[in-house]
Amino acid sequence: LTGLFLAMHYTSDIATAFSSVAHICRDVNYGWLIRNIHANGASFFFICIYLHIGRGLYYGSYLYKETWNVGVVLLLLVMMTAFVG
């Protein structure tokens, strides 16, 4: 949800990307808060994913090859999506 609000004001053009982030933080009402919530929420999301992987390792879920491979593919897709934005 916060990503949608940030995307309304962000431009990915190389010449205006940094100024659009400054615009979000300075000119948008509570833009700094939306940006911080977005960053912290994303970090918490990945912590939850890593805990889920750790739980799978602890309980031996890696023995179910097909299920584990689907999870690895989903993890890679989530990481690629987060990196690209």
Curated annotation (Swiss-Prot):
GO terms for cellular component: mitochondrial inner membrane. Pfam families: Cytochrome_B (PF00033). GO terms for molecular function: metal ion binding; ubiquinol-cytochrome-c reductase activity. Binds 2 heme b groups non-covalently. The keyword Metal-binding applies. It is a multi-pass membrane protein. It is found in: Mitochondrion inner membrane. GO terms for biological process: mitochondrial electron transport, ubiquinol to cytochrome c. The cytochrome bc1 complex contains 3 respiratory subunits (MT-CYB, CYC1 and UQCRFS1), 2 core proteins (UQCRC1 and UQCRC2) and probably 6 low-molecular weight proteins. Component of the ubiquinol-cytochrome c reductase complex (complex III or cytochrome b-c1 complex) that is part of the mitochondrial respiratory chain. The b-c1 complex mediates electron transfer from ubiquinol to cytochrome c. Contributes to the generation of a proton gradient across the mitochondrial membrane that is then used for ATP synthesis. Belongs to the cytochrome b family. Heme 1 (or BL or b562) is low-potential and absorbs at about 562 nm, and heme 2 (or BH or b566) is high-potential and absorbs at about 566 nm. This is Cytochrome b. It comes from Pomoxis nigromaculatus (Black crappie). The gene is mt-cyb.
